[in-house]
Amino acid sequence: MLRLFYFSAVIASVILNFVGIIMNLFITVVNCKTWVKSHRISSSDRILFSLGITRFLMLGLFLVNTIYFVSSNMERSVYLSAFFVLCFMFLDSSSLWFVTLLNILYCVKITNFQHSVFLLLKRSISPKIPRLLLAFVLISAFTTCLYITLSQASPFPELVTTRNNTSFNISEGILSLVVSLVLSSSLQFIINVTSASLLIHSLRRHIQKMQKNATGFWNPQMEAHVGAMKLMVYFLILYIPYSVATLVQYLPFYAGMDMGTKSICLIFATLYSPGHSVLIIITHPKLKTTAKKILCFKK
């Protein structure tokens, strides 16, 4: 029964990854066409373009790895497995940093705080987006290299199982995993929660202001607040279980877990990227309009 449940989880994971690949290809193509036509691109669309490419490569790599694992007639190469893991870690970290930057941009641009730091960020963040994207790629590369370095020095063993159920030890330390992932993920989590909290606080202040002035609640600023807040909150709902599931999958004792636990981790780890990509499309006016045209849902 558990084997059937795990097999169903693998099938669902593959389907979700196909959906994610299509969604991120759509995001990338739409923003690329806009960039080519107008010879300019907004800061948020530049981040979405980078995010779409990164997630497309990451989900494609996951599918290649899954197909290789299922269909290969040879024993699984330890070095090829390590290559898949390292590439996935780099792309995953980059995509999470891009989402974090997107949330920061929404928070800074939409909130109406008059603090000098916010006013400075409002003026200066957009021109710095390309350099920030590059900086986050370098941070992701650094954390991946840190993982490699620590894994070589760590004494903790890990079991890797081949297709013929032969197990052997490789030096893949739990310490290296925890340090490299926590360094990146904890900071991302703090920034995203802070951005969402500031946006909610700004929305509450805006509502109170509208109540005092006896004006209508729903206006362009309110719509921007609510749209960005929904995207951030849904992102956190998807991101928290995803982070836990991904961390568990990388741990040495994951191979010895029961099929039920593996199935749950697989579903949570797979649901985040496609789910968040769909949310981006339905909350982004241009992407939503283009998607409706493609699906023939014109009003």
From Swiss-Prot:
Pfam families: TAS2R. GO terms for molecular function: bitter taste receptor activity; G protein-coupled receptor activity. It comes from the Eukaryota. One of its GO terms (biological process) is detection of chemical stimulus involved in sensory perception of bitter taste. Disulfide bonds: none annotated. It is a multi-pass membrane protein. Residues 1-9, 68-81, 153-172, 252-262 are extracellular. The chain crosses the membrane at residues 10-30, 47-67, 82-102, 132-152, 173-193, 231-251, 263-283. GO terms for cellular component: ciliary membrane; membrane. Gustducin-coupled receptor implicated in the perception of bitter compounds in the oral cavity and the gastrointestinal tract. Signals through PLCB2 and the calcium-regulated cation channel TRPM5. In airway epithelial cells, binding of denatonium increases the intracellular calcium ion concentration and stimulates ciliary beat frequency. This is Taste receptor type 2 member 4. It comes from Gorilla gorilla gorilla (Western lowland gorilla).
